Amino acid sequence: LGLLLVESAYLAIFFRLMTGVFLALVYPPSLKLISTWFRRGRGLALGALVGSITLGLAAPHFINAIGWLGWELVVIATTIATLSGALIIGIFVHEGPFPYPRAPFHMGRIGQVFKNRGVLLASVGYFGHMWELYAMWAWFLTFSRMAFIELNIDNPSAASFFTFAAIGIGALGCIVGGIMGDRWGRTATTSLMMCISGTCALLAGFVYDGPLWMLIALGLIWGFTVVADSAQFSTIVTELGDPMYVGTALTVQLGIGFMLTVVTIWLLPLAAASLNSWQWVFLILIPGPLIGTCAMLFLRRMPEAIKIANGNR
């Protein structure tokens, strides 16, 4: 909301940075909090949480697609939604019947967290996943706008609606991924989703200039799979990590993962400027799901994996 009150670019950037900081402070505690309500079905529970975040992230694209609304109304609408969420949590949400021991974050415990090979591999998988996820979300609107122009569809609202659909369908993906993770296994689910999303990153350039139905189909499949596995990495940490260090482990995993997103979000427009086109920029994202898949397949073969998803690995 501060963006509406300032005229200085520096202050606007500051408010954007603070938005990111406070979002980061919400995410790890919310994952830990919802985990205290579930011993079985935890993957679905965390998947539903990440799915709601995904739908919330997609919502501004829908608001933006309504052409007569200015960007100011987009900011106001999303701010109202955020404050409503805070009010609901403050009044109705509390810790569940399966709490973790209370232990403050401690830098000295980071080494202990990563001495756990299962947590380490789950985190590497998450890092690969994050290399792809937020860059896709951040630049898919620009990619689709440029692609639509190539297809003689010069309508920014159409690209915004498409981006809303491509990102928003990830909410359903998170729920499906949670169900698959609980029933079929988390390492198998994450590996499958990263294989599909990585393939979509590879194929995006080939459908850039049509046909339109292939571009739309790829966008929806990519949006569904790119985030469907997101909650499963954190769920694995809650299952394999020392209960005393779960909060620290989640914070470290998420913190490093979000730092990696800065790299790919920064790289993609540089690549587009260098190539003078957005057609092939998503190739930069492929190493993420490739490395992440390898990490999860290694984890699947470890004896500790029997603790994941009640033995479903």
Each predicted region: which residue ranges?
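Intracellular juxtamembrane helix-capping segments at the cytosolic ends
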Residues: 25-38, 228-242
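C-terminal membrane-cytosol helix-exit motif in multi-pass small-molecule transporters
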Residues: 80-99, 292-300
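Cytoplasmic helix-loop-helix junction between adjacent transmembrane helices
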Residues: 15-51
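Helix-loop-helix hairpin linking two adjacent transmembrane segments in secondary transporters
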Residues: 40, 48-93
